């Protein structure tokens, strides 16, 4: 056992020592040392005031408080006790313990007389201490008879029993260290105090049989201690594990007889019973089941509404300090309460039906998506060239492509007419990174000029890319600086500006590239992005071909008037031209205006039908909200169409698109657009939308 450490071996008793390494802590005499018993085991006993001389007090502990030990006794019945009086023989420098009392009754209080010759004027409050030469050991003959062995440099040590029945506290005010080993099946208080502070007593509680057993264990341990002292400083190498095993064995042996935590098993009269039997007997007596209830017992087997919150809000009776309710008022309140419960049940039933319907729709959608994935992977994609235009594939396409195969289908549908390879993407990306570095380091303008495009134009494109990326799907927070897709989006847009310097970067491209990146790898997204922007409609808008853009607007108005004549007239009356709302929709392919999942479904059919579906989708939106739009003026219509509602119903939206007929006087979209392109060269005002 090392200095400053105190160990215990019963019921989780823990001892802690506090080292005091100040030099010169020597006490010459032991004034008085008595271990006392209180009159009651629940309260401390106060003794007469004792004063020590200033010389003796000068060697006492001054850096810590006087130490207030605590006594917590939960057992109100008398317990067999044994009290120890420790006295010093006048002829020997040894402290000999004396058995003072052992009975099953409560002990009388005892307080020693004040020492003679004490100077009360110069005395201060301080604890009595053991002299270094006054003793070798102090043995407490309690049921946990152990040894107080002298060591060095301790000022205060306290013992607190972790037993749930009683509490044990040992407080020793001494200039020397005390290594204590306390073994107790009950609890006790040991206080070596001789001052003005409250006088606490040394009490150990146990039975006689347990006392003898513990004394035998202590005697064996004392014999081992003498052997270990012969080994000198190497003793701890041989006993480090053996002592721990013995202490653990005693702990296991005695913990079986004690109380379980939280009072599950009280200490019975027959301590030899098995702990499981005691547990069962106590549970039977208390009427509690031996096994915890199954979690399934708490699960509601039906979904019937139980208005628990409503019943908690309604009080049946008034408080006792108020007059009782009249019979009429009580009946009225009871009826109101029943009506509230009925309404609550109706609301809960309606909500449950709504949730059940949503769950059924979700399950049906997941099942249809799973079946569609199998169909696309096993039947359509292996035979793409022969099946992509079949009626079955078109029907599946309209219902929406499963996300797991969407990127592959988009790549096949868009095609690669430009024959862009992954190596070309790497070259364009490397050139873009080189230009970014040159701009950041202030490179010369001559190094960055290429194909007639000045460095200022390229720098403007790079700044616009940086600004536009930060505004791309801001709610997702994945394309902004530090997001997982920021670098990928920056690479695709930068590589495209190097691939098509004549087009450069136009605001709105970031949304198209972002949707492709969410479904394809970076290189494949770049290939699809380049081929998609090479389509006639996208090239007209991104190159800002004003004449061709007006032709597309004129073709749109032809089918607008054919399908929605009433709304078309309302727009004409308020001078609402298509460019107010179509430019944003076409530039971003609805990825900015519609929710992302709905925009992806629009992209699915757009990859199948081409640019015609973009204008058909616009007519479907106008048809879906035509009742609202006809009651709005110019400003409100423009605001509504540029900021569509976020909770668009997908099925109603696509049903509205399906109702749009893309035929006008037996002419389809392509035929009408071609005719308008021819007429635009001859007649600049061939359509109302072309009038300036």
Curated annotation (Swiss-Prot):
Signal peptide: none annotated. One of its GO terms (molecular function) is GTPase activator activity. Residues 271-287, 326-335 have a biased composition (Basic and acidic residues). Residues 400-610 form the Rab-GAP TBC domain. GO terms for biological process: regulation of autophagosome assembly. PROSITE patterns: TBC_RABGAP (PS50086). Residues 270-303, 315-335 are annotated as: Disordered. GO terms for cellular component: autophagosome; Golgi apparatus; recycling endosome. Keywords: Golgi apparatus, GTPase activation, Phosphoprotein. SUPFAM superfamilies: Ypt/Rab-GAP domain of gyp1p. The keyword Phosphoprotein applies. Gene3D superfamilies: putative rabgap domain of human tbc1 domain family member 14 like domains, Ypt/Rab-GAP domain of gyp1p, domain 1, Ypt/Rab-GAP domain of gyp1p, domain 3. The modification Phosphoserine is found at residues 91, 294. SMART domains: TBC (SM00164). It is found in: Golgi apparatus, cis-Golgi network; Golgi apparatus, trans-Golgi network. InterPro entries: Rab-GAP-TBC_dom, Rab-GAP_TBC_sf, Rab_GAP_TBC_domain. Interacts with ULK1. May interact with RAB11A and RAB11B, but does not exhibit any GTPase-activating activity toward these proteins. Interacts with TRAPPC8. Plays a role in the regulation of starvation-induced autophagosome formation. Together with the TRAPPIII complex, regulates a constitutive trafficking step from peripheral recycling endosomes to the early Golgi, maintaining the cycling pool of ATG9 required for initiation of autophagy. PANTHER family: RAB GTPASE-ACTIVATING PROTEIN 1-LIKE, TBC1 DOMAIN FAMILY MEMBER 14. This is TBC1 domain family member 14. It comes from Bos taurus (Bovine).
